[in-house]
UniProtKB/Swiss-Prot annotation:
Its EC number is 2.7.7.4. The keyword Transferase applies. Pathway: Sulfur metabolism; hydrogen sulfide biosynthesis; sulfite from sulfate: step 1/3. GO terms for molecular function: ATP binding; sulfate adenylyltransferase (ATP) activity. The gene is sat. This is Sulfate adenylyltransferase. SUPFAM superfamilies: Nucleotidylyl transferase, PUA domain-like. PANTHER family: PTHR43509, SULFATE ADENYLYLTRANSFERASE. Belongs to the sulfate adenylyltransferase family. It catalyses: sulfate + ATP + H(+) = adenosine 5'-phosphosulfate + diphosphate. The keyword Amino-acid biosynthesis does not apply.
Length: 389
C-alpha cells in the first residue's frame, strides 16, 4: 500500500530552490515591506515547505469567507482556519492589486518571502474569533493576536526564500512533507500515526504514542517548535526531552521524529483539524487526538476536538483521528490506563498532564516517576533550576 495522498492531491511548496534564493532576497530588499507577526511568519514557513498544501499563499476573500462560514475553501476542499496576512487601513490604502511586496519578520527583521497581491479586503475581527476560537474572550491568546492585528487582509500567492534558521537549528530533525514521505516509504510504512505535542512527553503521552504505534506501521512524533504562549516550555528544552525519551523508551525501528515551525493558535477543535490536514501532507494516515487537543484554559469541552471530525464527510480528510480518552497512572493496575479500560476509582488514579507537571516544577517540586521518565525529569529539573538563578 502507498502513503495517503496529500490534501488536494499534490504537494504545493513555494520555497524557492536554493540556487534562486539569493536573487529573490535581493529583489525583495528593493520592494515595499510588510512586517509580519510571528504567526504570519510561521505560516510563511509552513506554506514554503508545502505543509499547508494546497494553499500557495495567504487567503483571498473567497477562501477566507468559506473557511469562516463552513470550514471549506472556495474549491470545496476542507480547511478549518484562516491563513491570512493583516495590514492596517493606512497601509492598505497605498497597496494595489498586482503589486509585489517583501514579507519581513517583525521580530527578527529577516526577509522571508515575496507576496503578489491578488486581493485586499476588510474583515470582522469578532466574527473571525468566534468562528475560529469559539470565543471572543480577550484572555484567549489567539483572540489577543487577532484583535491586535491590522483591519485589512492581503491575499495572494507567495514565494519564500528563507526558513529563518530552523533548518540549521534543528539539523537532521527539520523536514519538509516531501522529505518525510520519502523517509516513510524507505522504511516500508504505508500507515503512519502522527503525535502532535507542545509539551515534553510525560507518561500519558508515551502511553498514547504506543497505542498509535501498535495500530500503524510507524509513529511520527511531530513536536511544534514555533512560538508558544508565555509559560510554555521553550522548544530547545523540549527538543532535548524528546530525544531522551525516544532513545530510551521507543523502538527506533518504528518511530521517527521531526519538528515543524508553526505557531500555536490554541484553536482547540479547529486546530485539531488543521493538524490532521497538514499531517496528511507529511504522509500520515492517522493522528492521535486526545483530551482537549490544542486547547487552552477551559474554552473547549474535553473531547470537542474529537467530535469536530464528525462534521466532515468521509474522504474529506484522509488523515483520520485515533480518538483516545484521558489516560492516567492507576495504582491498582500498577500502570497506565484510560477511562475506557480501567474499572478503578478516582482515588486510585494519578492524573497526569503537562500543566500539572509545569506547576510542580514551578513550585520546586519534583514530579514522581508515575508522571514522567527519569531522563526527561532530569532535563526539566535543570531547566527550572536555571530559571530560579
Amino acid at each position: 500500500m502507498a502513503l495517503v495522498q496529500p490534501h488536494g492531491g499534490k504537494l504545493t511548496p513555494v520555497l524557492a530552490p536554493k540556487e534562486q534564493r539569493a536573487e529573490l532576497k535581493a529583489k525583495a530588499e528593493k520592494l515595499p515591506v510588510i512586517r509580519m507577526s510571528s504567526r504570519e511568519s510561521s505560516d510563511c514557513l509552513m506554506l514554503g515547505m508545502g505543509a499547508f498544501s494546497p494553499l500557495t499563499g495567504f487567503m483571498t476573500q473567497a477562501d477566507y469567507q468559506g473557511v469562516i462560514d463552513n470550514m471549506h475553501l472556495a474549491s470545496g476542499l476542507a480547511w478549518p482556519l484562516p491563513v491570512t496576512l493583516a495590514v492596517t487601513k493606512d497601509q492598505a490604502a497605498s497597496i494595489e492589486v498586482g503589486q509585489e511586496l517583501a514579507l519581513v519578520d517583525d521580530e527578527t527583521d529577516i526577509y522571508v518571502g515575496i507576496i503578489k497581491v491578488a486581493d485586499k479586503y476588510e474583515y470582522d475581527k469578532v466574527k473571525e474569533c468566534k468562528a475560529t476560537f469559539f470565543t471572543d474572550d480577550a484572555d484567549h491568546p489567539g483572540v489577543q493576536k487577532v484583535m491586535s492585528q491590522g483591519e485589512v487582509y492581503l491575499g495572494g500567492d507567495i514565494v519564500t526564500f528563507s526558513e529563518m534558521g530552523y533548518a540549521t537549528k534543528y539539523a537532521g530533525y527539520y523536514a519538509h512533507p516531501a522529505e518525510t514521505r520519502a523517509l516513510f516509504e524507505s522504511k516500508g510504512w504505508s500507515t503512519v500515526c502522527a503525535f502532535q505535542t507542545r509539551n515534553p512527553l510525560h507518561r500519558s503521552h508515551e502511553f498514547l504514542c504506543k497505542i498509535g504505534n501498535e495500530v500503524c506501521d510507524g509513529l511520527f512524533l511531530h513536536p511544534i517548535v514555533g512560538k508558544l504562549k508565555k509559560g510554555d516550555i521553550p522548544a530547545e528544552v523540549r527538543f532535548e526531552c524528546y530525544k531522551a525519551h525516544m532513545e530510551n523508551y521507543f523502538n527506533p525501528a518504528t518511530i521517527e521524529m521531526r519538528v515543524y515551525p508553526m505557531e500555536m493558535r490554541y484553536a482547540g477543535p479547529k486546530e485539531a483539524i488543521l493538524h490532521a490536514i497538514f499531517r496528511q501532507n507529511f504522509g500520515c494516515s492517522h493522528i492521535l487526538v486526545g483530551r482537549d487537543h490544542a486547547g487552552v484554559g477551559s474554552y473547549y469541552t474535553a473531547y470537542q476536538a474529537q467530535e469536530i471530525f464528525d462534521e466532515f464527510k468521509p474522504g474529506e480528510i484522509l488523515c483520520q483521528p485515533i480518538k483516545v480518552t484521558a489516560s492516567y497512572y492507576c495504582k491498582k493496575c500498577m500502570g497506565m490506563a484510560t477511562e475506557k479500560t480501567c474499572p478503578h476509582t478516582k482515588e486510585d488514579r494519578i492524573a497526569i498532564s503537562g500543566t500539572k507537571v509545569r506547576e510542580m516544577f514551578s513550585k520546586g517540586e519534583l514530579p514522581p516517576l508515575e508522571f514522567g521518565r527519569k531522563e526527561v525529569l532530569e532535563i526539566l529539573t535543570k531547566y527550572y533550576q536555571s530559571l530560579e538563578k
